[in-house]
Amino acid sequence: MYRKGAQAERELIKLLEKHGFAVVRSAGSKKVDLVAGNGKKYLCIEVKVTKKDHLYVGKRDMGRLIEFSRRFGGIPVLAVKFLNVGWRFIEVSPKIEKFVFTPSSGVSLEVLLGIQKTLEGKS
């Protein structure tokens, strides 16, 4: 699964760069996978890939992401590539202890970045 994860990270780097973000990949750091910024918004991203229709992410993984993001001054983001659906993103909250992530739990990259609004009118 490492190869799929690294490939997904590189794919997400290209998507973020298309939207004007500078991106650094932090392979093997055990903290975050990507750090991205555009001078206005800074994202600390944990990247996951799954063939399933859901993904369980534990408290420990989210705790590392949240703590790094707090220290860095960025937004903690979980990016999941569902192989049969595509990319979905969610801002991670410290209140979450364990989380089952499904495609309907997240938003598109454009909504996350504030480029596109959701049907509820939220950006």
Swiss-Prot record:
Record's keyword annotation contains Ubl conjugation: no
Residue numbers marked as site, Transition state stabilizer: 48
Any one GO molecular function term: crossover junction DNA endonuclease activity
Temperature behavior of the protein's activity: Optimum temperature is 70-75 degrees Celsius, enzyme is fully active after 16 hours at 90 degrees Celsius.
Cofactor: Mg(2+); Mn(2+)
Effect on the protein upon substituting residue 56 to A: 30% HJ cleavage
Any GO BP: DNA recombination
GO CC annotations, alphabetized: Holliday junction resolvase complex
Record: residues binding Mg(2+): 9, 33, 46
InterPro entries, per the entry: Hjc, Hjc_arc, Restrct_endonuc-II-like, tRNA_endonuc-like_dom_sf
pH dependence (UniProt free text): Optimum pH is 8-10.
Cell inner membrane is among the record's keywords: no
Active site: 29
Effect on the protein upon substituting residue 72 to A: No HJ cleavage; at very high levels altered cleavage patterns. Dimerizes poorly
Mutagenesis / variant outcome for changing residue 11 to A: Wild-type HJ cleavage
Domain of life: Archaea
Membrane spanning stretches: none
Regulation: Cleavage inhibited by RadB in the absence (but not presence) of ATP.
Reaction(s) this enzyme catalyzes, per UniProt: Endonucleolytic cleavage at a junction such as a reciprocal single-stranded crossover between two homologous DNA duplexes (Holliday junction)
UniProt keyword list: DNA damage, DNA recombination, DNA repair, DNA-binding, Endonuclease, Hydrolase, Magnesium, Metal-binding, Nuclease
Subunit structure: Homodimer. Probably interacts with PCNA and RadB.
Function: A structure-specific endonuclease that resolves Holliday junction (HJ) intermediates during genetic recombination. Cleaves 4-way DNA junctions introducing paired nicks in opposing strands, leaving a 5'-terminal phosphate and a 3'-terminal hydroxyl group that are subsequently ligated to produce recombinant products. Cleaves both mobile and immobile junctions. Binds 4-way junction DNA, a synthetic Hj, binding is not competed by dsDNA.
NCBIfam families in alphabetical order: Hol_resolv_Hjc
Xref: PANTHER family: HOLLIDAY JUNCTION RESOLVASE HJC
Family listed: Belongs to the Holliday junction resolvase Hjc family.
Identification of the protein by name: Crossover junction endodeoxyribonuclease Hjc
